[in-house]
Amino acid sequence: YTLIDDSGYKNLESPITIKCSHGHLIKTTMKRFRRETFECPKCNNDIVVNPKVVPPKAAGATRVVAFDQATEHFGLSVFDNNKLVYYSLYTFKGTLDSRLVAITRMVRDIVIKEWRPDYICFEDIQYEKNIRTFKILAELIGIITELCKEAEIRYEIVMPNVWRRYANTAGKDRRTEKMLSVAKVKELYNIDVSDDVAEAILIGRYAVRRIGATTSLAFGY
């Protein structure tokens, strides 16, 4: 961001005008601008609703892909620089083995080969009382991790409480957290999505900020 006008500045509540990297002029206050979650509202409003395809990756763009992964419902989001350009829910059916094979092919042949991400971020496993579910999710993380390593793509496995703290969607239980995620995405982008997609979008937002906050991507691969 570039500061354009702070002539009336007296304190954190004073009005200022800044310009984002896309040239949008934003009137805000220093207090709002200093928040970790501050983003250009005009960029966020320029969102394609229910996009059917992932747009071609622009020259010089940093593409981030984020997952809220499970073997049946797989939320996914794509950001070019800090702009949300695609989001979708992939559904997999059949036996566990067939679902894992389908997910492997989707991540390898579509996400990695066609979309050409620079960075992939996905959620770490939450504690599960059901040991079978825990093992399945661990296997899924292992598959995605190996695909990232094989393609030499930088990645991050983020703990749920970390990205939720950034998104301000932590709740007393999982149901509340899902509702908060859907509401947060509606607030930010004015789109209606499922909780799986909402969480994939918020994980992507976290990853975009994570990349912007570090000069060297030393974590992950």
Please provide the spans of the model-predicted regions.
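Functional cation/ligand-contacting sites centered on basic and imidazole/sulfhydryl donors
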Residues: 1-55
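Phosphate- and other anionic-substrate recognition elements at nucleic-acid/protein interfaces
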Residues: 52-221
